[in-house]
UniProtKB/Swiss-Prot annotation:
Full protein name: GDP-mannose:di-myo-inositol-1,3'-phosphate beta-1,2-mannosyltransferase
Domain of life (superkingdom): Bacteria
GO molecular function, one term: glycosyltransferase activity
PANTHER family for the chain: GLYCOSYLTRANSFERASE
UniProt signal peptide: none
Source species: Thermotoga maritima (strain ATCC 43589 / DSM 3109 / JCM 10099 / NBRC 100826 / MSB8)
UniProt EC number: 2.4.1.361
Required co-factors: Mg(2+)
């Protein structure tokens, strides 16, 4: 089977990461994959979310195939011939508010194959145009996307399929850390706003009063956090996923910065790296509300409610090895349930139900 993706690739965003996880699983299963990526100029206009990583493109990625637009003042374009000549059996569109709806609609009308839209949009306002794409099926990561967005636009329920965001397979990477083994190392990475590091800095400074071996390692793509201390190491990089696994395996706890939002969201970062089994601590918010934990916030991840709750839970992770092992067991169950191989098969099964 020859499967095409219309998507970002090699960037720090959940849209491109979803395509990367699925594409690599399809290839492992023996299918051929072609990725049609946007022009660098148009994608990089979304400064907040689009940052290229240090990874090199594989041969199956074709860039400069379409433009990202705002769909209100711009129509954009798609190089139809570049896609049509591939003779695809299935096209998966990673859909969010910047895909060019009008030229894509014209392309879809010419394709005589199943077309699946993976719906990434987070609220009804940004979804206004992209819900018009004439795809055969719309995949959402959980029921919230239908209940809070697609139903608003009267999209038929039978057109919508719930398929979880996939968990990336773990990399067999050697642990790396910037400090000695006697330090208890907390780690954060990404492009989140600096304000979302406040809880972690606050909590760790409190913990330092009891534990002088606490160290915090921060890697950001958009500059340093404006706070310096001898117990903090900061790097400005956009490492590959394989390198991230080295850093995670060298760390004791992963502090994942996510703020509050009213939008319908998932944390693609979490699904990208949870298989490392380094305990993830994250604010209890809409990003993780569908991930089940016990009443205390412990499960495959650790959810915290406020600073005091965060300090208490970080202290437990430092002192209670049995708790850490229990979290790792929960992670393995989560990875088995939502692994990329299983999710990829669900997409193939869905495609088989589409008749052309």
């Amino acid at each position: 089977m020859k499967i095409g993706f219309l998507s970002r690739w090699g960037a720090t965003c959940g849209v491109g990461m979803h395509a990367e996880i699925l594409a690599r699983e399809f290839i492992r299963m023996g299918h051929e994959v072609v990725v049609f990526a946007p022009t660098e100029e148009s994608a990089s206009k979304e400064v907040k979310y689009y940052k290229r990583t240090e990874a090199q493109d594989p041969e199956f990625v074709k860039r400069e195939i379409y433009t990202e637009v705002d769909n209100v003042t711009e129509e954009g374009w798609v190089k139809e011939e570049e896609i049509l000549k591939e003779n695809l059996d299935l096209l998966i569109i990673e859909t969010f508010w910047r895909v060019p709806v009008k030229p894509l609609t014209r392309l879809i009308e010419k394709l005589k194959i199943p077309v699946i839209s993976v719906f990434h949009e987070a609220n009804i306002f940004k979804a206004r145009e992209v819900v018009k794409l004439p795809c055969d099926k719309i995949v959402v990561f959980d029921r919230r996307f239908y209940d809070e967005i697609l139903e608003f636009y009267e999209i038929p329920r039978e057109k919508v399929e719930v398929i979880s965001y996939p968990v990336m397979k773990p990399y067999d990477a050697e642990p790396e850390r910037p400090v000695s083994e006697d330090k208890f190392l907390f780690f954060s990475f990404g492009r989140q706003p600096v304000e979302e590091y406040c809880d972690f800095l606050n909590a760790l400074k409190k913990l330092r009063k009891r534990f002088d071996n606490v160290h915090y390692w921060i890697i950001r793509s958009d500059g340093r956090v404006d706070y310096e201390a001898e117990w903090i190491t900061q790097w400005q990089k956009r490492p590959t996923v394989e390198k991230l696994y080295s850093y995670l395996k060298g760390s004791n706890v992963h502090l994942l910065p996510k703020g509050n939002t009213p939008n319908v969201v998932v944390s693609s970062t979490l699904y990208q790296i949870i298989a490392s089994e380094t305990p993830i601590v994250i604010r209890d918010s809409r990003f993780v509300e569908t991930i089940e934990t016990d009443v205390y916030g412990f499960g495959p991840i650790v959810k915290y409610r406020n600073i005091h709750d965060l300090v208490h839970k970080l202290e437990l992770l430092m002192l209670d090895r049995e708790l850490v092992e229990d979290i790792k067991k929960e992670v393995r169950v989560f990875v088995e349930k939502y692994g990329g191989d299983k999710i990829a098969q669900e997409f193939l099964d869905l495609a088989k139900t589409i008749t052309k």
